[in-house]
């Protein structure tokens, strides 16, 4: 696991990393630290113990007689240097690794973790290191390849459980291509946090396998444990996480739904004070707890025998290093002096000095937080900072100010730098490491990696048109954390690009098929712009609409009239109507249906959901189906017509409601069917509304490219209250580019505030703990907000409540609010006091790729089969629509399922054609309102409909 935090105060940072432990003093803690990274190598400190003054100087941006930072002025007008200190990347090993490394002091397992951390840092240097440089007066991001990292290894959690974790404190500096130190652009690290975490998991899993241990993947996120450790063993030594989960649960919040701020608050609230234990006492307590769960010396000996057997079977490798202190030397594969040539597997060359002296030289600390201890007050080191004791020369240029000096092989030059700043005279320093050529790197791609990349691309392209490359990397590594490496995935993506299977654009990927689908759609719509005759003669359109206005007794809005005129008079097969919510699209469609029918056309409608299709038909009189059902029926009709030798069809107009929900695949299918049926299509919707869950934004694309003739409906008529209408007008106002200006949201909230429509719940700060800066108790604040909101809702009369909604972005809020509302309704006797417990099924919304991968399944999931089949082993027939429960996964890569009659069958997920659900418990009483999530045609129940019990 990886967590990322900013280091806030450089002066207090070392104290935090030194002193936040239980049985080491300051010097002991420093003895077990290490500088790492190519940047550290340039400075000549790579592999050396961290020294207080050097650490402080680098955190404060003093490096090789340069002072990094921005010149600012304080309230007294005095200049000072403002420099962001750095980032703390905390790599935490799985609990089974911590038990082996800390409780039983297995140095091979510990080394696997340390190597994984260093390999991950090297990967960050290779792919996720950026800086900003000035190019012709413009600040631009630039790739770099080196970091200066301080490594601190700790071994306990705040709850005194074994927890192997390493703080990798990344200094805010990198040596750029111009041989100048500049600050990091750390967005790339934060943006790729999940991928970096997966790289660490992958490195660690493969390192453990390389020393002879098996690992068991626990979920689809790539989390794993050493094989043999039971969930009970892991839980016993995970008290810290249990504390946080219970703290959230006591407030009705699931940790999976809790935002980061609430998790942090729970961590602070449950954080215990440090307790005084010596190392021997603590380890003895650990062993006693472990023994009670079956983690005996015999249990551990069996695992260590695997390691010894693996080492004896490994090819002998002469070692040039005495690895008595594995923390300080590490393994040769992590040495930055070695050029990176790519690797396809983790080296299994591990020293096996079973009787070697390897005292535990790691320090203990709690979970990551920002440094808050006392500052260091020693002299600054001259080893790295050069002339840092002098007042730094600075330039107030709104960018990093530099005092430059030349360094060769990490040692400062004594001769002064030439004053001529000509770029032609700049001689790049010799780097003490070989710079990586990413293009020429040779990596052997395993078959498993190819499967993983295929899975990742299939998964993401089902719902996104252009996928950030980092998403593919992360998902592919999680596919098989034991075998798939970061570099192999990159190599496979490069291969697929060269073979024109995928397309890369600005760091994003898509498939050639999807890209071709977009291009075809654009060209097809353009080709059909003069392909049909007008529905109504152009000279008669205005007269006919005037007549309709007289019949209605009111005029159309400008948007309604323009849309109708465009549809009736256009020669294009495809027309777009881009209309905001509340602009009268229903009225426009009613008129369209009436006039088109008079002119011999059949109007048909389609919508994304059953409820939407039902409402479209009820409100406009246009017969409508879901998009999926419409396409099925149209395909069947066209096949029947083709079979019967052709039948004359009446002219048709297809209305696609809420077109922003149409995926690229569906969009192309609709175009194809319309062309074959010689039908016209009106795409109706708002391109800025919610998009399709599937890949692509075709409705927006064809408008932005100008190929779809589109009319606009932006005249708000839904809001009758002028104050609310003013607010809506501000929200939907567009900028010069024709897009809604999100910055107007502030103005909209100001208007609502002036109208006294915003009610803020203020919770007084409680407690005086300086460490928490007297921050509000977020749990108490949220609870009071919930109660106030429910109170306001319940004060409405029943009719008003039936037409009101409480909206929240968090699932945990939804559960709590529903509980509070139900409690109040029972007090009013609007709900029966007797609850009945029901199991409900919640769709996992797995993609097709996810449904076919066994790691995504968990016990007690429910599978609904989309087609019938017979189990070959048992002869049991599973009918289409049957629901079966997942019991377990077997060693053959199949799921063991159980049906309603308790029959067991084995099923391979790769066969697909299923829906996957998770079960949840719900309390339901007479008077409750439920929402249906699956259509049942035989009972005329539609997806999305609501019913009262």
Map each language-model feature to its residues.
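ASCE P-loop NTPase helicase motor core
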Residues: 472, 573-748
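Conserved helicase motor core of P-loop NTPases
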Residues: 520, 532, 536-537, 543-549, ...
């Amino acid at each position: 696991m990886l967590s990322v935090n900013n280091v806030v105060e450089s002066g207090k940072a070392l104290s935090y990393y030194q002193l936040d432990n239980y049985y080491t003093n300051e010097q002991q803690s420093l003895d077990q630290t290490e500088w790492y990274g190519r940047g550290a190598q340039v400075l000549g400190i790579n592999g050396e113990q961290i020294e207080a003054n050097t650490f402080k100087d680098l955190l404060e941006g003093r490096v090789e007689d340069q002072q990094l930072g921005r010149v600012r002025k304080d309230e007294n007008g005095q200049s000072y240097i403002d420099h962001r200190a750095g980032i703390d990347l905390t790599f935490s090993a799985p609990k089974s690794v911590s038990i082996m490394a800390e409780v039983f002091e297995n140095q091979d397992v510990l080394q696997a973790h340390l190597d994984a951390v260093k390999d991950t840092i090297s990967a960050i240097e290779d792919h996720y290191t950026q800086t900003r440089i000035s190019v012709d007066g413009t600040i631009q991001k630039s790739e770099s390849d080196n970091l200066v990292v301080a490594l601190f290894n700790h071994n306990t959690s705040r709850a005194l459980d074994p927890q192997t974790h390493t703080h990798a404190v990344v200094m805010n500096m990198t040596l750029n291509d111009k041989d100048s130190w500049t600050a990091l652009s750390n967005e790339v690290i934060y943006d790729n946090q999940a991928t970096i975490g997966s790289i660490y998991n992958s490195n660690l899993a493969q390192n453990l396998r390389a020393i002879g241990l098996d690992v068991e993947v626990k979920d689809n996120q790539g989390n794993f444990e050493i094989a043999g450790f039971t969930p009970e063993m892991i839980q016993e030594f995970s008290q810290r996480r249990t504390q946080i989960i219970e703290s959230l649960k006591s407030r009705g919040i699931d940790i999976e739904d809790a935002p980061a701020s609430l998790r942090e608050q729970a961590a602070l609230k449950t954080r215990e004070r440090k307790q005084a234990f010596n190392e021997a006492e603590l380890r003895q307590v650990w062993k006693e707890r472990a023994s009670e769960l079956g983690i005996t010396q015999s249990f551990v000996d069996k695992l260590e025998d695997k390691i010894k057997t693996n080492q004896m079977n490994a090819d002998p490798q002469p070692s040039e290093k005495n690895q008595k202190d594995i923390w300080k030397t590490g393994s040769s594969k992590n040495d930055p002096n070695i050029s990176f040539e790519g690797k396809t597997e983790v080296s299994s060359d591990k020293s096996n000095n079973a009787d070697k002296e390897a005292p535990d030289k790691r320090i203990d600390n709690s979970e990551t937080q920002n440094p808050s201890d006392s500052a260091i007050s020693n002299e600054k080191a001259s080893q790295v900072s050069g002339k840092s004791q002098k007042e730094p020369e600075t330039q107030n240029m709104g960018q990093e100010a530099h005092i430059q000096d030349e360094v060769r092989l990490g040692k400062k030059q004594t001769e002064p730098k030439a004053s001529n700043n000509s770029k032609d005279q700049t001689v790049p320093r010799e780097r003490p490491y070989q710079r990586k050529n990413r293009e020429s790197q040779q990596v052997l791609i395993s078959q498993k990696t190819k499967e993983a990349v295929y899975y990742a691309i299939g998964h993401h392209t089902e719902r996104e048109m252009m996928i950030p490359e980092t998403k593919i990397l992360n998902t592919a590594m999680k596919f098989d954390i034991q075998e798939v490496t970061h570099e192999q995935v990159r190599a496979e993506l490069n291969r697929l690009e060269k073979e024109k299977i995928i397309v890369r654009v600005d760091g994003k990927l898509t498939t050639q098929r999807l890209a071709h689908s977009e291009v075809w759609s654009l060209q097809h719509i353009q080709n059909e712009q003069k392909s049909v005759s007008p529905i109504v003669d152009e000279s008669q359109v205005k007269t006919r609409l005037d007549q309709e206005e007289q019949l209605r007794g009111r005029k159309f809005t400008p948007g309604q009239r323009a849309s109708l005129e465009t549809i009736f008079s256009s020669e294009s097969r495809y027309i777009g109507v881009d209309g905001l919510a509340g602009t009268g699209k229903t009225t426009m469609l009613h008129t369209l249906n009436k006039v088109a029918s008079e002119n011999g056309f059949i109007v048909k409608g389609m919508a994304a959901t059953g409820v939407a299709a039902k409402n479209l038909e009820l409100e406009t009189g246009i017969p409508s189906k879901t998009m999926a059902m419409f396409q099925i029926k149209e395909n069947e009709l066209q096949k029947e017509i083709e079979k019967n030798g052709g039948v004359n069809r009446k002219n048709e107009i297809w209305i696609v409601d809420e077109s922003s929900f149409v995926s690229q695949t569906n969009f192309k299918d609709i175009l194809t069917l319309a062309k074959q049926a010689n039908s016209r299509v009106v795409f109706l919707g708002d391109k800025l509304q919610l998009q399709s869950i599937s890949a692509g934004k075709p409705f927006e694309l064809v408008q932005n490219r100008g190929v779809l003739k589109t009319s606009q409906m932006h005249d708000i008529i839904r809001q009758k209250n002028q104050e609310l209408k003013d607010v809506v007008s501000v929200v939907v106002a567009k900028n010069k580019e024709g897009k809604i200006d999100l910055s107007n949201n502030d103005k909209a909230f100001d208007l609502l505030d002036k109208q006294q429509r915003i009610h803020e719940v203020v919770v007084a700060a409680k407690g005086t703990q300086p460490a928490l800066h007297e921050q509000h108790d977020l749990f108490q604040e949220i609870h009071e907000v919930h109660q106030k909101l429910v109170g306001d809702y319940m004060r409405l009369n029943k009719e008003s409540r039936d037409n009101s909604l409480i909206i929240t972005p968090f699932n945990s809020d939804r559960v709590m609010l529903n509980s509070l509302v139900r409690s109040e309704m029972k007090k009013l006797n609007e709900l029966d006091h007797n609850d009945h417990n029901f199991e409900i099924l919640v769709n996992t919304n797995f993609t097709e790729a996810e449904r076919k991968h066994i790691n995504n399944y968990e016990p007690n999931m429910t599978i609904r089969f989309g087609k019938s089949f017979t189990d070959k082993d048992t002869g049991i027939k599973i009918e289409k629509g049957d629901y079966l429960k997942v019991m377990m996964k077997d060693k053959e890569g199949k799921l063991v399922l159980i049906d309603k009659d308790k029959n067991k069958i084995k099923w391979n997920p790769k066969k697909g054609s299923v829906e996957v659900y998770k079960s949840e418990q719900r309390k339901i009483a007479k008077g409750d309102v439920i929402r249906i999530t699956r259509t049942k045609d035989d009972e005329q129940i539609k997806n999305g409909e609501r019913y009262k019990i």
